[in-house]
């Protein structure tokens, strides 16, 4: 998946990421850009507009939770399937989340990282992160196979 050099680059960069801010924005953007994903979050209250979603405290809190899990995965890049096994089971068996949504969230996360980190988020770093988010999405979808 990733070379040792790529792992060093993504983990080094990840230390600069403000997980609470990036997580909140990434989940919020997912819900706005792909509104059908909102069906999993109806209990979060008002999701009636982009502003409502982006300012929703429950969306922000869950976005941080999602990125906390992603951060854990960043510590275990060689065992993403093992790291995300329980979350894969939860999302497959109990929540019935379409695994395609994991790919969508990964792509939104890359957009948010680029927005927050500007020129520091180079095309090469983006390519490396695309590998990471694809690996995480694959690990989360593992239970579906």
UniProtKB/Swiss-Prot annotation:
Residues 1-145 form the Globin domain. InterPro entries: Globin, Globin-like_sf, Globin/Proto, Hemoglobin_b, Hemoglobin_oxygen_transport. The keyword Iron applies. Red blood cells. One of its GO terms (molecular function) is organic acid binding. Heme b binds at residues 62, 91. The keyword Disulfide bond does not apply. Keywords: Heme, Iron, Metal-binding, Oxygen transport, Transport. Signal peptide: none annotated. GO terms for biological process: hydrogen peroxide catabolic process. GO terms for cellular component: blood microparticle; haptoglobin-hemoglobin complex; hemoglobin complex. Pfam families: Globin (PF00042). Belongs to the globin family. Involved in oxygen transport from the lung to the various peripheral tissues. Heterotetramer of two alpha chains and two beta chains. This is Hemoglobin subunit beta-A.
